[in-house]
A protein has these predicted regions:
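Low-complexity, Ser/Thr/Pro/Gly-enriched N-terminal "stalk/linker" regions
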Residues: 26-93, 103-107, 111-126, 147, ...
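An alpha-helical repeat/solenoid feature that recognizes helix-turn-helix modules
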Residues: 47-71, 92-116, 133-160, 172-210, ...
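Feature responds to low-complexity, polar/acidic, surface-exposed segments characteristic
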Residues: 129-131, 173, 177, 203-206, ...
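Glycine-rich, acidic and aromatic/proline-enriched surface loops and short helix-turn segments
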Residues: 169, 197-198, 218, 245-246, ...
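Bacterial N-terminal signal peptides that target proteins for export
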Residues: 1-10
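Sec/Tat signal peptide C-region and signal peptidase I cleavage site
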Residues: 21-25
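Bacterial N-terminal signal peptides
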Residues: 10-18
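Terminal, non-catalytic domain-edge segments
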Residues: 26-37, 266, 280-320
Length: 393
């Protein structure tokens, strides 16, 4: 019976999704122009991308998540060079900086590739070492969570919660986060918020996020921008936009509009047509590739929101290609709902379309379809707050 009814159920969900996810308010033409212009600039500048924290992985990630047309040969070239690099390094990308693994996992996931088999090596499993990852401070666990959750990858039981708890323990008095000191930094606070978004159903996470967003709002300048270490820069505005994106908040959330100016407007003030983004607005500033890459990621998030697609780091639309659905009547509905971030696979590369649908999964899909915010209650004795479905019931 389930086999006969699954396509109809998924079709009904897809129709509901069309109603529940209206297109976001039209992004200003300048944002679309900046997206296409910056994508073109980086594509030409980084002609042969490879594994690199600058002018490599982030460029490929931004292009892949933008949804703009890019020739497949560009991505295939990156994958070939990445595989060769990883093989040359014998799978050891760095002894201490485990963000190297997270970054590569994010790019591979965006390209629909399996990070557990690249050049004969597994670049996902190093993120399973809590001690090694957490030695890097806040950025290690934050990006490990982004990488693990980007494709819904299986991980050792309790590992994700360890990372979440580690991040929460670093919260500053009054809210927010910083790599050092007692003053919240907008970039770091925004990055941590991005990584915690999937865990917003946990009360402690939700409360920390509320304080962090309040701190970011207080840090916002009158022109809509943000300053990191006393310098107003494009990267700070970009990261705050990505935090709003991750939590599904409006980019013009009233808390982030100062004197009529938004973070998106502030970001665009750093854009130079035909050249990408500058780091600061000083007249003598030259184009900085890191500014271009982070600007591209934020603009891609804006673009995806406008098209009603999932957030930048929710990559089930890219990674979920299920071979067993070939010829299955539910294939198209599954792929479209996956692209919307409503459903995902089993975490092992399969979808199992004829498996029973449990109540936890159904409630999760319904909440996502209706655009509701997950919220934990203790109504059910057999549901743990830390469970992936706890906030959806």
């Amino acid at each position: 019976m389930l086999k006969r009814r699954l396509p109809a159920l998924l079709l009904a969900l897809l129709l509901l999704a069309a109603m529940a996810f209206p297109a976001a308010a039209e992004t200003k033409p300048a944002a679309e122009d900046a997206l296409q212009d910056t994508a073109r600039y980086l594509h030409d500048l980084v002609a042969e991308p490879t594994v690199s924290g600058l002018g490599g992985d982030w460029t490929v990630l931004g292009l892949a998540r933008s949804g703009l047309p890019v020739e497949r040969a560009y991505y295939d070239g990156y994958l070939a060079r990445a595989a060769a690099y990883i093989a040359e390094k014998e799978g050891i990308l760095h002894q201490r900086k485990y963000t190297e693994y997270s970054r590569v996992v994010l790019v591979l996931t965006a390209l629909g590739q399996n990070p557990r088999s690249v050049g004969g090596y597994d670049v996902l499993s190093p993120l399973f070492s809590f001690d090694a990852v957490s030695r890097q401070g806040l950025t290690g666990p934050a990006f490990a969570l982004l990488a693990l959750d980007s494709g819904g990858y299986d991980a050792p039981e309790g590992l994700r919660q360890q990372y979440v708890d580690h991040l929460l323990a670093q919260e500053l008095e009054g809210g927010g986060f910083a790599l050092s000191g007692v003053v919240a930094d907008p970039d770091v606070t925004a990055m941590v918020l991005q990584s915690l978004a999937p865990y917003g159903a946990q009360e402690t996470v939700a409360q920390a996020a509320e304080r962090a967003f309040a701190r970011l709002s207080a840090l916002q300048k009158d022109n809509g921008g943000f300053a990191s270490y006393g310098v107003e820069c494009s990267e700070s505005a970009a990261q705050v936009l990505l935090a709003l994106d991750a939590w599904g908040l409006p980019f013009d959330d009233p808390r982030f509009v100062k004197n009529g100016h938004t973070a998106a407007e502030a970001l665009l003030s750093f854009w130079r047509q035909g050249q990408g983004f500058v780091h600061t607005a000083q007249p003598d500033q030259s184009i900085a590739i890191v500014s271009c890459e982070q600007g591209l990621l934020a603009l891609a998030a804006l673009h995806r929101r406008q098209e009603g697609r999932g957030s930048l780091y929710t990559m089930t639309d890219a990674c979920a290609r299920f071979p067993e659905l070939s010829g299955h009547p539910a294939r198209q509905a599954v792929e479209e709902l996956t692209a919307l971030g409503v459903i995902s696979g089993m975490g092992d590369g399969t979808f199992r379309p004829d498996a029973p649908l449990d109540r936890a999964s159904f409630c999760t899909m319904a909440v996502k379809l209706l655009g509701l915010t997950p919220r934990w209650t203790d109504r059910f004795d057999d549901v743990a707050q830390s469970s992936w479905y706890g906030g959806y019931l």
